[in-house]
Amino acid sequence: MIMKLVEDLLNKNLDIDEYVERTYERIEKIEKKIKAFITIRDKEEVKREVREKLKNPKGKLSGILIAIKDNISTKGIRTTCASRMLEDYVPPYDATVIEKLKQEGAVILGKTNMDEFAMGSTTETSYFGPTRNPWDLERTPGGSSGGSGAALAAGIVDIALGSDTGGSIRAPAAYNAVFGLKPSYGTVSRFGLVAYANSLEQIGPMAKNAEDLALLYSIISGDDPKDATTIHFEPQVPEKVELKDVKIAVLKDIVEASDKPVVSIFNSTLDKLSSEGAIIKEVNLGYAEYALPAYYIIAMSEASSNLARFDGVRYGYSKYSEGNWRETFAKNRGEGFGIEVKRRILLGSFILSAGYYEEFYIKALKIRRLIKDNVDNILKEFDLIASPTMPILPPKIGEVVEDPIKMYAMDLNTVIANLAGVPALSQPAGFYNNLPIGLQLMGRYLSDYYIMAISAKIEKVLNLYDLTAPIS
């Protein structure tokens, strides 16, 4: 638990040098095997900063090392988005969430690997190479925040930040047996996040237990004048919650589309919650078959607009400067972006072109509204919506990345929360042949603290928290 770790550091029950050395020894031992990081800061520099933070302790995270997904701007620390396009980019400013973490005494250990520009579900589209799952090195850690998930599972850090556009925090949380929250839309500033799809994405916390997840969320959340999409809200922290009489809706049409091993573990989890007094009932989401197409149409359309700025003139890879503008633009973007990013830019541009805008984009927005209305209606009757986080077990490296349809289908269970704007978290539900499987909980808008409080009860019932993969 982070609060205990801070206390031990402040009371000198844990030596600062020992804490930092232990972390870097772990990195030295396993980082080459898993490739969780793109950039790792100098050990002595980190040690000095930890000492400084503990000399003048001002916050809840005094001296604590944290891993940051590499699409979140960090002043003076390279931020690549796992792309050749931004291979050498060093931001001159911090994202709002980074400012908040620093104010609370956190120290950045490094920037984690991810799918290029957060476009992917396996952390295989990174220009710097794939991240491997610490539970099984032949498999992916999920994506796009796979580096953050792997760093947690491998025992390198206790807390991390990710971003979630259609499941990019929850997928790695599920596949790495850790906890991850996609916050209610607008509760965490996106200022300093390199945008993929503005109307869907949120920065969110990742941790090894529900308590640390809630602590990290409490620090990074809040309105921000630099981000017009943030809202002012009063945190609704429940004093006490119990599983008894909690009404949980199970999305039948989502569960039925999941693989048998996943459903088996999920049903076993539901049985345990039922024995604790939870009231569980199956419901149909409705429009489930349209959720993925609607999500990808919206996300790709927004991506094609957001990534237009990376032209090799104003931003990004600029190897070519001679010739006419069209030639240099095409060459720089052609070499600067990877295959998956180019695929999504092209599809997004096509969708937004004359004659197809109303046929695809407007229809996708209508489906989004229908799904949001259905989610809201279900949550008027129930306290929570539950489903497996991912429909399949962690795929092997190379198994889905070459097949876009297979990779996109992995997001079926998670995109619903992004389309509806509601909070959703993933926590460990169990293992099948030593492979982690996640439980997803969705709640009403702004019920983030409530679902994390329920998650804290569930982790104790399942006895699945503070897990570390047996990798050495």
Swiss-Prot record:
Record's keyword terms, sorted: ATP-binding, Ligase, Nucleotide-binding, Protein biosynthesis
Annotated Pfam families: Amidase
Protein name in UniProt: Glutamyl-tRNA(Gln) amidotransferase subunit A
EC supergroup of this enzyme: ligase
Membrane as UniProt keyword: no
Function: Allows the formation of correctly charged Gln-tRNA(Gln) through the transamidation of misacylated Glu-tRNA(Gln) in organisms which lack glutaminyl-tRNA synthetase. The reaction takes place in the presence of glutamine and ATP through an activated gamma-phospho-Glu-tRNA(Gln).
PANTHER family named in the record: GLUTAMYL-TRNA(GLN) AMIDOTRANSFERASE SUBUNIT A, MITOCHONDRIAL, TRANSAMIDASE
HAMAP family the record matches: GatA
Location of the active site: 69, 144, 168
Catalytic reaction annotation: L-glutamyl-tRNA(Gln) + L-glutamine + ATP + H2O = L-glutaminyl-tRNA(Gln) + L-glutamate + ADP + phosphate + H(+)
Coiled-coil blocks: none
Molecular function terms, GO-annotated: ATP binding; glutaminyl-tRNA synthase (glutamine-hydrolyzing) activity
Matching InterPro entries: Amidase, Amidase_CS, Amidase_dom, AS_sf, GatA
